[in-house]
């Protein structure tokens, strides 16, 4: 498993313990006490590092090459998943996957950004950066879900919508704007979960819902830290400073009222234990459906509208501005 920059002390100690255990197996010497001391030291070190993660550390975890994707969670959370393809206008975008499935026996529509696990798949899925046809495919599935009264679950994980020439020619901004408009008025429950990076309008194209949740080490922002640093300081190397200033973590966004709940992650990140992470997401989805149960269509839309109207409201007090 690939190590991150801040994890090097932990990895080095783990390797030392493993080497000592291997040596003990192949010799008559007993190092059990030394191993016990090192394992205790490892536990304290992990608690210190993972319990005090900086914003940039969380950015690295959110971008981890082995971080679970939408299809990983679909495999663990849903049954009878049937993927649907194409937007019926141009083509099929592999950067967004979606289809119908069953959640605890209940028919649902599942949609999400999809990154690749290796170079070949990343190229096929455009590194999880959708074209307009991806957002139009997602909208087609949402309207289908509305027609058949199926709840919608969206998984958000993208650096952003693809900014290439062809994407712009096919109406990238219109496709995202159309999704925002249509999602706001859907008459079925919509649950959105940020599972990795939530980047700019590319994330918002799947991000209008009744409840917005984030995994503990995911990020959600209007631009990447590197992009913000390049614009503000003409230096992408100041990405760490930008990340600190942008308030992009789950804890920051919950405090600001942008998201509803934070879903805990395994120590070190979701990639450490996909099954356990799926169970944590499952608990949150179940809890959210319980909260949405019994709400009429009109009330659903009204509450969703009120939710977004509150975001960004400010009050002036003693010349200070506070985000509600």
Curated annotation (Swiss-Prot):
Subunit comment: Acetyl-CoA carboxylase is a heterohexamer composed of biotin carboxyl carrier protein (AccB), biotin carboxylase (AccC) and two subunits each of ACCase subunit alpha (AccA) and ACCase subunit beta (AccD).
Protein name stated in the entry: Acetyl-coenzyme A carboxylase carboxyl transferase subunit alpha
Classification via SUPFAM superfamilies: ClpP/crotonase
EC number: 2.1.3.15
Entry-linked InterPro entries: Acetyl_CoA_COase_a_su, ClpP/crotonase-like_dom_sf, COA_CT_C
A GO BP entry: malonyl-CoA biosynthetic process
UniProt pathway: Lipid metabolism; malonyl-CoA biosynthesis; malonyl-CoA from acetyl-CoA: step 1/1
Biological function: Component of the acetyl coenzyme A carboxylase (ACC) complex. First, biotin carboxylase catalyzes the carboxylation of biotin on its carrier protein (BCCP) and then the CO(2) group is transferred by the carboxyltransferase to acetyl-CoA to form malonyl-CoA.
HAMAP family noted in UniProt: AcetylCoA_CT_alpha (MF_00823)
Gene (UniProt): accA
UniProt-recorded Gene Ontology molecular function terms: acetyl-CoA carboxylase activity; ATP binding; carboxyl- or carbamoyltransferase activity
């Amino acid at each position: 498993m690939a190590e991150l920059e801040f994890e090097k002390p932990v990895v080095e100690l783990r390797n030392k313990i493993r080497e000592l255990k291997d040596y003990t197996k192949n010799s008559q010497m007993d190092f059990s006490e030394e191993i016990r001391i090192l394992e205790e030291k490892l536990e304290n070190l992990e608690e210190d590092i993972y319990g005090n993660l900086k914003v940039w550390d969380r950015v690295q975890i959110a971008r981890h090459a082995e971080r679970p994707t939408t299809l990983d969670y679909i495999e663990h959370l849903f049954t009878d998943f049937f993927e649907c393809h194409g937007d019926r206008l141009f083509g099929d975008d592999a950067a967004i996957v979606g289809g119908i499935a069953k959640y605890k026996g209940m028919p649902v529509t599942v949609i999400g950004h999809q990154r690749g696990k290796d170079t070949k798949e990343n190229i096929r899925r455009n590194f999880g950066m959708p074209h307009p046809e991806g957002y139009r495919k997602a909208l087609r599935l949402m309207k289908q879900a509305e027609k058949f009264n199926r709840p919608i679950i969206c998984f958000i994980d993208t650096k952003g919508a693809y900014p290439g020439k062809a994407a712009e020619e096919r109406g990238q901004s219109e496709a995202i704007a159309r999704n925002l408009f249509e999602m706001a008025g859907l008459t079925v429950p919509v649950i959105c979960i940020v599972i990795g990076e939530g980047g700019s309008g590319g994330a918002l194209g799947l991000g209008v819902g009744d409840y917005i949740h984030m995994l503990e080490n995911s990020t959600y922002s209007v631009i990447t830290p590197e992009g913000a640093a390049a614009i503000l300081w003409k230096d992408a190397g100041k990405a760490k400073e930008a990340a600190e200033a942008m308030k992009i973590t789950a804890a920051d966004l919950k405090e600001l009222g942008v998201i509803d709940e934070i879903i805990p992650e395994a120590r070190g990140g979701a990639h450490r234990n996909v099954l356990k992470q799926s169970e944590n997401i499952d608990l949150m989805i179940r809890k959210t459906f319980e909260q949405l149960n019994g709400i009429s269509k009109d009330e659903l839309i009204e509450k969703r509208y009120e939710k977004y109207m509150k975001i960004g409201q400010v009050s002036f007090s003693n010349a200070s501005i506070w985000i509600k």
